[in-house]
Curated annotation (Swiss-Prot):
GO terms for cellular component: extracellular region; nematocyst
Any Gene Ontology biological process: regulation of signal transduction
Main subcellular localisation: secreted
Protein name (record): Delta-actitoxin-Aer1a
Disulfide cross-links: 4-43, 6-34, 27-44
Location of this chain's protein in the cell: Secreted; Nematocyst
Segments traversing the membrane: none
Example GO molecular function: toxin activity
InterPro entries: Anenome_toxin, Myo_ane_neurotoxin_sf
Keywords per UniProt: Disulfide bond, Ion channel impairing toxin, Nematocyst, Neurotoxin, Secreted, Toxin, Voltage-gated sodium channel impairing toxin
Function: Binds specifically to voltage-gated sodium channels (Nav), thereby delaying their inactivation during signal transduction.
Species: Anemonia erythraea
Similarity-based family: Belongs to the sea anemone sodium channel inhibitory toxin family. Type I subfamily.
Domain of life: Eukaryota
Length: 47
């Protein structure tokens, strides 16, 4: 999957882990949409 910035990682990408992943059919349980993504399927696992 492709990385993306999680909403809970902070306001910028510098120094933050891009621990998101692309899920084609929506986010699995415990995963949520990535910050700043309009497209569905970009998910990140929240702490």
């Amino acid at each position: 999957g492709a990385p993306c910035l999680c909403a809970n990682s902070g306001p910028n990408t510098r120094g933050n882990d891009l621990n998101g992943i692309v899920w084609v059919f929506g986010c699995p349980s415990g995963w949520h949409d990535c910050h700043g993504r309009a497209m569905v399927g970009y998910c990140c696992q929240e702490d």
